[in-house]
């Protein structure tokens, strides 16, 4: 199969090819095979609009979905070549950052696998978020180029004009084929400008934020610490939705739509608030087609659905009207009319689209002018209904619904953990690959010692593979025979990497005092901090200082290791997750909408150590008290304390000598010798005088839960049982289930034509 492509491309055999030649040949093979698959088509089509799609490397995922992975692997192996080497050679697309983008990628996989006609719509970022480098124990940001001639991008001949205030631009469209597992294909549509100039980037990720023609799609989430950066974000968002809206209407017409019946031909899912301007833009385009304003607004409402991904007020975007007047003056009167319509109907400034400071509340517009509003975990949706969006819930109870997030098992089990996947197939059959709930069959083996022993062997092999990878890529030798305790996620105070760091200090001080743990402990972190998020970068600095401090300490380093993985991304997650023993899901209760890392860890046999937050609540319900470590205050307690406004972190600090010792250590002479005094002092003061995400109240319970997990780990037989229960109950968290629910209750798409 591959040999034929190699001969056609290079006139030689696989064994004679260089790595880049083989990669090009594999890319050609996959594009050819995917191109031969029928695309999902139907009268009604979904458009999943998102600012980010964290799709990860695509080579092996596509080979698996196309059903040719083993065949290609053997063909390469027979010629003395390694598919693993080619996987390492492939660049990872820089199109996303955290859970939002990874969820979107999982959803595209499931939409295609379920044979539903649905495409992603986003932007073709040249440098993505950034490539993270550590220098002097600090995060530094560098561009993260990924496009080359051997790219998954296929340039389309479609083009759309976008009118900004004062100038027009012509968008180009690139597609990435989305292969379904043993199914047909869909597309990820990515819009770009040919005029974007990568050479304007200098000194890390600095660039002229005002030259929109040259900078528009350079970076995901440009630094918003000043108005120029914030304005650029609005330019990006309007560019994305204007192109998307034009594409949607064009394709709907091609399928026979008269636009009055648009909702019968298109379903638009607004993924968080970044694509919100698609609502006024679609209304504007429908009015241009001769449809009256009120009817256009009704059509758009029946077509659009909104997914809320956050409980954090600062993440619900509110743009000054002056920004929209500058970027997209054509939609300003539309937004104003929508606001007048709402004000006349409800007479409540709390639900207005435009507030007293002349800011446009994107989430408010989404809720009023979408037919569905969903949260992404049971607890999250309940908090939206009862607290954060309660005013809207009283207006539109019928719109609110829950769709607990999910993950694609093709990537996070079949691809990331082939040892476990093969063992599961031998033990319970192959049905779980298409029907994840079939993993439940594994539960019947919980008392089978041979099965449990094999799970431990697989975990050990994956830990060795991770150790080898980190030695090769970062020069770090992980401790042998250790517990791997892992926290990998976007760096944010509410996710509370600072709590884990305080534990590392506590354990370091214990070992220094002669209290040696039964087994070595490796605390692994992976996280990027937004370039303008000062405290988040301070937390990374603290972790890197602890890493170095322990490396240098002969007494402690045999028993404790702190490691921050550089430039954490999907590829590194695929190495870390199968090797994990303890999954850190320690956000402040009520702040994490769902999380999906928790699901990936669970699927791969890690045991959750977490608060009752996001999807942790549902994991707890599924696995039971004995197979998860829950700690900390619940969401009701946290919400009540915020409402009272009486939290004082210093009270906890003064009353708990152990906590005080750990916090004070941040600014100790030892740490200041290793680190930046300004950064460490700023973080110390933030915790002592503010601690907005309540690290201190949960500290004692966190330490106790961690110690309990470490103690239980020593009973290997019982631990293997916990692993088995978690794996067997993970089927609920398949994104196939999530997408089926979206389709049954919101989109109402028919399966694509066979």
Residue ranges and their predicted role:
Residues 1-754:
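A conserved ligand/cofactor-binding region detector
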